[in-house]
Amino acid sequence: MQFFTTVVLFAAAAMALPGGQQSRPYDPCPNNLLSVPQCCDTDALGLVGLGCVAPPNNRPASPRAFADCCHASSRRPKCCAVTTGLEASVLCDDPAGF
């Protein structure tokens, strides 16, 4: 009888625990240095992004959504360290999921 009670308690505890991975919102630029999402025309060796603008949705929901909003203006998604405000960004790399 004690064995049955112990098994039932362990089974109940196992069912009460959350299963699987909890979904997190997509972060296109998880790197602390390259944390600014941008849509850029040109990337010169990862040092300077030219023709860069902020995506219409500053935090896209997925890699596909980020690419789609940038491709709508014929640009590519990038993560940059600093934006100059003159459609140029410094230190750019591909975002997460690319």
Swiss-Prot record:
It is found in: Secreted; Secreted, Cell wall. Disulfide bonds join C29-C79, C39-C70, C40-C52, C80-C92. Homodimer. Homodimers further self-assemble to form highly ordered films at water-air interfaces through intermolecular interactions. The gene is Hyd1. Residues 1-16 form the signal peptide. Induction: Expression is not affected by carbon nor nitrogen starvation. Expression is induced during Bionectria ochroleuca self interaction. Expressed in mycelium, conidiating mycelium and aerial hyphae. One of its GO terms (cellular component) is extracellular region. Disruption phenotype: Leads to increased growth rates, conidiation and enhanced tolerances of conidia to abiotic stresses. Aerial growth, conidiation, and dispersal of filamentous fungi in the environment rely upon a capability of their secreting small amphipathic proteins called hydrophobins (HPBs) with low sequence identity. Class I can self-assemble into an outermost layer of rodlet bundles on aerial cell surfaces, conferring cellular hydrophobicity that supports fungal growth, development and dispersal; whereas Class II form highly ordered films at water-air interfaces through intermolecular interactions but contribute nothing to the rodlet structure. Belongs to the cerato-ulmin hydrophobin family. This is Class II hydrophobin 1. Keywords: Cell wall, Conidiation, Disulfide bond, Secreted, Signal, Sporulation. It comes from the Eukaryota. Its main location: secreted.
